[in-house]
Amino acid sequence: MSTINTNTNEVMPHISVNAQYIKDLSLENPSAPSSLAALDQRPQIDLSLDINITNLSEENFYEVELNIEAIARNEKYTLFQIELKYAGVFNLINIDSEQHPILLSVHCPAMIFPFARKIIASCTQDAGFQPLMIDPIDFGALYHKKMSEHQN
């Protein structure tokens, strides 16, 4: 029988979320109220997403910012345009620095994305439209695509 020593002072590697917040939020409803009468057809949604990572002054503290922009259009109108900058402050505790890029580009954005998604859904609904429910995002695939583009 083996014994596991649980009396160590060693802190296990983990990611701590210190804060989450809206940095910037803008919703434009440029064709209202005419656009609200044209909701019988499904609009075309153009969506863009970008991730910014900032190393904060303290060791192993990072700000990860999601920049999401969505524009909804139909044949006649731009229905709405929403822009959201949503960020989190993360502390990478006892994690090898070689793992930081993938954690900051994949795991941290995945942790805060559901909150950004909810904000966008609520705002678009409050503007008189069906809530914009952004599909889940594969941050791992985005990271690997970006890395392969940098290598070429």
UniProtKB/Swiss-Prot annotation:
CDD domains: Translocase_SecB
Main localization of the protein described in the UniProt heading: cytoplasm
Coiled coil: none
Pfam families: SecB (PF02556)
GO biological process terms, semicolon-separated: protein folding; protein tetramerization; protein transport
GO molecular function: unfolded protein binding
Origin: domain of life: Bacteria
Keywords assigned by UniProt, alphabetized: Chaperone, Cytoplasm, Protein transport, Translocation, Transport
Compartment list: Cytoplasm
GO CC entries: cytoplasm
Similarity remark: Belongs to the SecB family.
Subunit-level organization: Homotetramer, a dimer of dimers. One homotetramer interacts with 1 SecA dimer.
Function: One of the proteins required for the normal export of preproteins out of the cell cytoplasm. It is a molecular chaperone that binds to a subset of precursor proteins, maintaining them in a translocation-competent state. It also specifically binds to its receptor SecA.
Name of the protein this chain belongs to: Protein-export protein SecB
Native species: Rickettsia canadensis (strain McKiel)
Upper taxonomic lineage: Bacteria, Pseudomonadati, Pseudomonadota, Alphaproteobacteria, Rickettsiales
